[in-house]
């Protein structure tokens, strides 16, 4: 993270020129962001939009905002926060500098992001599913308008991008980079009915706490990891595993020995690639010193002096000393989002941005799908998302997981089969197809 941001924010506060935010989506991530932004000088929340206006107002009140500050129409005082179900109205507010998109709905997110661009607003996008679908097209549109478009710091993709950037700036070769999660073979078939057992949670307690079964299903079945690693590949230029993520059961001590290429004794197909590691092994047993909530980068060197420094300065290395791992064992989601807001609002720089269309997250059947079955999309009963190189996905006519919801099968699809456009009746929304075609014209081919 860039040093000096807090001092600059304090100066903006003193000068009466705070970075003014409109938040679209007041769910878990948005609620965390609300709590923290209220504590930061130089950042001012001026609008919250959510289809559930009661949820938006509750999130603000729970964060300590007085009822008198909530404006359900036009602002009535200088410190009013507009609360609305109309995202477009919140985005259009003249004094908004940065829009935070946090709905979690990829198609809605694309619409909101493009509305923000049309209104001349910078955007921090929390809805990573939109970036996996059309991120490079969105970043290109922002650049053409002189605007900043950014991944959300606090989510794992932006934190991984930070580690990769650190490694490259300091002259290290990036061997692999990725995230931790909870996954083992068979978890890809997880449904909302089985998710709490797989996740290790009591179903009654999880439901009582209001946890979203579909969201947690997407975590457990591997879809969310595939989406996030697709975005990391797009933002960093790292390659995508041809067979999809391996979800290797690896603790932090084994990162440099396992997350290196096969020719060097590891388990990766090549150097310079994304991957995910699991906190449990194939039998469901816990991995020692797991990285379930964290992120990592493995760097390599052929320079014996650099390898010696890896050892002398306490890095975890493989037995050769040529590969070393650095990691962060947590991520604080919406509680860290103001890092992106400050970086975008003060410097006009993103905390990671999708650039190249090198990765795709495609839909794979979780069960046998009969003809005319409606696909329920990410985190549902019918499909999970698998990471693929973009050129492979297009050559096979694969349906992206972000466009799968609501489609109907035109023929029987067997469990484990890739869902292709020939398997369904529809072709997806016209505006999204246009954006995707613009990416295909600049597709990046994985080595």
Language model region names:
Residues 1-115:
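N-terminal glycine-/serine-/threonine-rich beta1-alpha1-beta2 phosphate-ribose binding loop
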Residues 142-143, 150-220:
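Rossmann-like NAD(P)H-binding beta-loop-alpha module
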Residues 2-11, 198-447:
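C-terminal catalytic/substrate-binding lobe primarily of soluble NAD(P)-dependent oxidoreductases
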Residues 60-61, 135-138, 161-164, 179, ...:
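Short acidic, glycine/serine/threonine-rich loops at helix termini
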Residues 103, 107-119, 127-148, 152-155:
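Rossmann-fold NAD(P)-binding glycine/threonine-rich loop
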Residues 54-55, 130-135, 139, 156-160, ...:
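Short gly/pro/ser/thr-enriched loop/turn and capping motifs at secondary-structure boundaries
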Residues 51-53, 104-105, 127-131, 154-155, ...:
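Short, ordered loop/turn segments at secondary-structure junctions
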